[in-house]
């Protein structure tokens, strides 16, 4: 039965590297809000909120901005409030 199994054992398999050899290492993203010691994210501060919005008007995800989960929730609610108050657009046209 074991003779029919042609799959190699773990010790026989070549090791795969997760990062391509010779490629640059990615720099860890820094939480902009925590780095600048911003305690309250105000919906009226559109200059700050525009950093977290794409050119199409969508909210950028955490993996792009590098914010923590807690600060991402605060940013999201502030952006949504600013949109309702017409301080930020829901979508932008090209």
Swiss-Prot record:
The keyword Ribonucleoprotein is annotated on this UniProt entry: yes
List the residue ranges forming a coiled coil, or say none: none
Query: Where is the region Disordered?
Result: 1-29
Q: Which gene encodes it?
A: rpsR
Q: How does it assemble?
A: Part of the 30S ribosomal subunit. Forms a tight heterodimer with protein bS6.
Q: What is this protein called?
A: Small ribosomal subunit protein bS18
Report keywords, A-Z: Ribonucleoprotein, Ribosomal protein, RNA-binding, rRNA-binding
A Pfam family that the UniProt record links to this protein: Ribosomal_S18
Do you know which HAMAP family this protein is assigned to?
Ribosomal_bS18
Molecular function in Gene Ontology: small ribosomal subunit rRNA binding; structural constituent of ribosome
Gene Ontology terms: biological process = translation
Question: Is RNA-binding set as a keyword in this record?
Answer: yes
Upper taxonomic lineage: Bacteria, Bacillati, Bacillota, Bacilli, Lactobacillales
Entry's NCBIfam families? S18 (TIGR00165)
The record's section on InterPro entries has: Ribosomal_bS18, Ribosomal_bS18_CS, Ribosomal_bS18_sf
One GO CC annotation: cytosolic small ribosomal subunit
């Amino acid at each position: 039965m074991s003779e029919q199994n042609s799959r190699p054992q773990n010790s026989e398999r070549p090791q795969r590297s997760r990062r391509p050899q010779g490629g640059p290492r990615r720099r860890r993203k820094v939480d902009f809000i925590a780095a600048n010691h911003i305690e309250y994210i105000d919906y009226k501060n559109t200059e700050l909120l525009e950093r977290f919005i794409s050119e199409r008007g969508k909210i950028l995800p955490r993996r792009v901005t590098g914010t923590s989960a807690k600060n991402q929730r605060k940013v999201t609610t502030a952006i949504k409030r600013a949109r309702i108050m017409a301080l930020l657009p829901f979508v932008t046209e090209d």
